[in-house]
Design a protein with these regions (language model features):
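Conserved PLP-enzyme active-site core in the AAT-like
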Residues: 1-153, 172
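Conserved C-terminal alpha-helix-loop-beta "cap" of PLP-dependent enzymes
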Residues: 138-194
Length: 194
């Protein structure tokens, strides 16, 4: 619909997974974008770990480019990220545009941290994320069964299995208040509350 209303669009940018852990239907979006002759770009900043839990990368699902922040869900240093490419956008084009958002003096410390994070993910990290996904699944069930809070589940939307999102809708507690309770009473720090 948006591409029909904006035929001048030169690309489509989506976020998947988003901050709440919701995944977009990348194969369907890629199909639509490519039918209109525009590339699909994915902000996968919070999805560097997804391969470890059995989720295909945006590129494997048909996206043209995907930006992945290795420092957000992998043990890489802050500001480290990688750009995944399907090859449909010529490498020369990427090189020409790199100075717009990159540097001519890359940090070898950041590059090394990306490589160490990759090695960890291929080794112990896969097991760590499998355990995390199992714990999140158990927490989703327990919260849904024993509290007044709603949790995002796979039945409601396709999700990152390692992201726990608790909703305060239809309760007398706000997200910020729940975050404070978790911190003060249980020593649990929420990454975000809104």
């Amino acid at each position: 619909h948006a591409l029909r209303q904006n035929p001048q669009a030169s690309a489509v940018l989506v976020t998947s997974p988003n901050y709440y852990g919701i995944l977009q239907d990348i194969p369907r979006l890629a199909e639509i974008c490519h039918a209109h002759g525009v590339p699909l770009l994915v902000d996968a900043a919070h999805g560097a770990h997804c391969k470890a839990v059995g989720l295909p990368s945006p590129i494997e699902q048909g996206a043209d480019l995907a930006a992945v922040s290795t420092h957000k869900t992998l043990p890489a240093w802050g500001q480290s990220a990688i750009l995944l490419s399907s090859g449909r956008i010529p490498f020369e084009t990427l090189l020409e545009t790199a100075p717009l958002f990159g540097t001519s003096s890359p940090s070898y410390l950041l590059l090394a941290s990306i490589d160490l994070a990759r090695a960890w993910l291929e080794g112990d990290g896969a097991q760590a994320y499998a355990q995390c996904a199992a714990r999140v699944q158990a927490l989703r069930r327990e919260i849904a069964q024993t509290t007044v809070f709603d949790v995002l589940t796979e039945e409601k939307a396709p999700l990152d299995p390692c992201r726990l999102t608790i909703r305060c809708t239809d309760t007398n507690v706000t997200g910020q208040e729940l975050s404070a309770i978790l911190h003060e009473d249980f020593a649990i720090d929420a990454e975000m509350a809104d």
